[in-house]
Regions:
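Conserved acidic segment of CheY-like receiver
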Residues: 18-29, 35-39, 67
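Acidic phosphotransfer microenvironment of two-component signaling modules
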Residues: 29, 50-54, 114-117
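CheY-like receiver
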Residues: 41, 57, 83, 87, ...
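A generic structural motif
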Residues: 42-46
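Acidic, metal-coordinating helix/loop segments flanking the phosphotransfer/catalytic sites
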Residues: 48-66
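Conserved phosphotransfer cores of two-component systems
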Residues: 60-62, 84-91, 100-101
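Conserved phosphotransfer microenvironments
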Residues: 68-86
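Output/docking surface of receiver
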Residues: 95-131
Length: 131
């Protein structure tokens, strides 16, 4: 492949994988650190939050493009936190890692048993839809 074509292909690939600010919350530290590391490898700036209180504190400190509520958070947390996200930062997208979420403040849900590759694809699609 000619150098100009390689450069063009690289630019279009990196344009589709733009860096976003993600707040990722879980109740299990091991899950939180492992999943956050994968998101960081994909090029996202990830802030982690442990439990509901951690998510609330992070929302008070900063604004995010996307808030991901992980599967180890309680059902109650996954229900109430989307309201808090939208109230704190109206334009922030909310992705819940739970197969059966139907919530009007949630922008997308994904089954947490899917591979990290599929989760990263869902993140990219959700962000691309807002541009």
């Amino acid at each position: 492949m000619p150098a100009a074509a390689q450069k063009s292909a690289h630019q279009s690939q990196s344009a589709t994988q733009s860096t976003i600010k993600v707040l990722y919350g879980e109740s299990d530290e091991n899950t939180l650190s492992a999943q956050a590391a994968e998101m960081t490898k994909a090029g996202h700036h990830v802030t982690t939050a442990l439990n509901r209180q951690g998510v609330q504190e992070a929302l008070r400190r900063d604004a995010f493009d996307l808030v991901i509520l992980g599967a180890t958070l309680s059902k109650d947390d996954r229900h109430h936190l989307p309201y808090m996200v939208k109230k704190s930062h109206e334009g922030t997208k909310v992705l819940v890692m739970h197969a059966g979420t139907h919530h009007h403040e949630v922008d997308a849900a994904i089954d947490p048993s899917l591979s990290m590759h599929r989760i990263l694809e869902k993140i990219a699609a959700l962000i691309a839809a807002t541009k």
